[in-house]
Amino acid sequence: MYAAFLGLGMSVAILGPTFQDLAENVNRNISSLSLIFVGRATGFLSGTMIGGVLFDHINQFFLLGASMVATAAGLYLIPFCKTAVLLIITMSVFGASVGVVDTGANVLILDLWGDKGAPQMQALHFSFALGAFLAPLLAKLAWGTAPAQNHTESDLDTLMLNRSSNGTSDSVFAVPDDMNLLWAYASIGTFILVVSVFLFGLFCKKHSRQKKPRASAEGARRAKYHRALLCLLFLFFFFYVGAEITYGSYIFSFATTHVGMEESEAAGLNSIFWGTFAACRGLAIFFATFLQPGTMIVLSNIGSLVSCFFLVLFDKSPLCLWIATSVYGASMAATFPSGISWIEQYTTLTGKSAAFFVIGSALGDMAIPAVIGILQGHYPDLPVVLYTCLGSAIFTAILFPVMYKLATLPLKREDQKALPTSSRL
């Protein structure tokens, strides 16, 4: 499962450093192609909901193996798409298979280790972050194209116009002009395909279904404002995941067009973000043994606020961009798992409430990068990406104390008596 999530991290993060290459491959500029984020997130959301149902009726290893094969197929097909519509559709199918794997891996960890699986769960998400760290290196350093000239958004528009008028625009599915783009996606797809073989091997070996360890009704807890708390956490994850994906996906393009970095430098910057993210997510496994989840969230919010403030203040400084990106990646690492651990201290999570969080994060993944892509096209001279991350950091920093206040309000005695018989969300 760790290898599967390693491949998953690479497959998701590869979009950032290859975004401009994909845009050139379909003769579009970056702002007009931002809908691929919507397509991928919509597919992910659908796959998450479908996977949650299927894992109760189909062997988990078989479904995971089949989803990994579908993920690999999507990675193989993406570089061959020569129109934006076909690319968005392919990205949607790819996102659906990723959503099934994401849901299934988390469910499988809970099935195997139950409430004692916190280290395994942290290690699973650390594997994802490690894959996201390796993706830019693989894209631009291992299979990287020759360093290109830095272009503004208007330069890219002219370049796309010339390519579409000189090239053959009739084909919708063809070998890409840039073979390095093909090899970058194909290498990750091959790794995922190999992992799927081992999952099918486990399916053949284990025919019996594992028993799902569930918390007993005696240990159930319910906060006084349970539903309001879930809605606020939905918003919290919406902005947190949206900012994380936006920065990880657009920092490469931002560094080359706004700051004037070379492609190899920008790829290194992208790797620094995901590298500090992965390293601190690994360290969070040990910090969680002596720090409360709420404390880790507060520290993460402070780090995000400070780093985003300096990013906006010195948006043209390469040195500040390197340092603040490192701090921002480190600050974002522990927020998501700490948020889940924190709310479990005050109210018991059911399958429905967990799915609610996933929907919030998926919608943030879908909406915020797409909106930022459109805004960046209209205001190419403004650091829209940095403004968005700062706004999200301010919002989550204000929202968490409100959530904490709601969670710690005392529960009435009659509500506590009625809790064991309640089966609502």
From Swiss-Prot:
Membrane topology value: Multi-pass membrane protein
Gene Ontology terms, MF aspect: symporter activity
InterPro entries attached to this UniProt entry: MFS, MFS_trans_sf
Keywords, ordered alphabetically: Cell membrane, Ion transport, Membrane, Sodium, Sodium transport, Sugar transport, Symport, Transmembrane, Transmembrane helix, Transport
Subcellular location per the Swiss-Prot or TrEMBL entry: Apical cell membrane
Keyword Coiled coil tagged: no
Chief location category: membrane
Keyword set includes Cell membrane: yes
Transmembrane segments: 35-55, 61-81, 84-104, 123-143, 183-203, 228-248, 271-291, 294-314, 320-340, 355-375, 382-402
GO CC terms of this entry: apical plasma membrane
Pfam families linked: MFS_1
Tree of life domain: Eukaryota
GO annotation (BP), single: sodium ion transport
Chain's role: May function as a sodium-dependent glucose transporter. Potential channels for urea in the inner medulla of kidney.
Family the UniProt entry places it in: Belongs to the major facilitator superfamily.
Name of the protein this chain belongs to: Sodium-dependent glucose transporter 1A
Organism of origin: Mus musculus (Mouse)
Gene responsible for this protein: Mfsd4b1
